[in-house]
Amino acid sequence: GSMNWLRIPRPIDRHIVEMSLRQVDMLPLKDRQIGELSGGQKKRTFLARALAQQAHILLLDEPFNGVDVNTERAMIQLLMRLRDAGHTILVSSHDLSAISTVCDQIILINQTILAYGATSEVFTPENLNRTFGMPLPGIMS
């Protein structure tokens, strides 16, 4: 929802924020100041902020950077549910494992677009070597 012209949150606005915080497991920390949160908690809070806007397109910059393994797993599951519900999710990330799970389409960029398409077609040893300048063992296509 959008706030009224006085910018006073309505009950529906508060409900949307509460639901967004619940989705990222931050509701118990809702009364904390942002400076009191860890890096991973801030990432989840920023994701909740994006969810509260109820947009169908999400643009996320390094969403998995600085979060623990359990938080990353929970975020991936949430993003997959959003994707399956019809949301478009654009992710800028160096975490190839996480994005290969979440993303259907990949663009590899190193000063220019080197490869794009379905994850299985793009994540080849040749493309990854061209992108990162070295072989990346363990990243499977």
Label each region the model flagged.
Residues 99-101:
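A short, surface-exposed alpha-helical micro-motif characterized by mixed small hydrophobic
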Residues 33-37:
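Conserved ABC ATPase signature
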Residues 93-94:
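H-loop/switch region of ABC-family ATPase nucleotide-binding domains
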Residues 11-29:
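Conserved ABC ATPase "signature" region
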Residues 58-61:
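Catalytic Walker B motif of ABC-type/P-loop ATPase nucleotide-binding domains
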Residues 69-71:
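Helix N-cap at the start of a conserved alpha-helix in ABC-type nucleotide-binding domains
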Residues 111-121:
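Conserved switch/coupling elements of ABC/ABC-like ATPase nucleotide-binding domains
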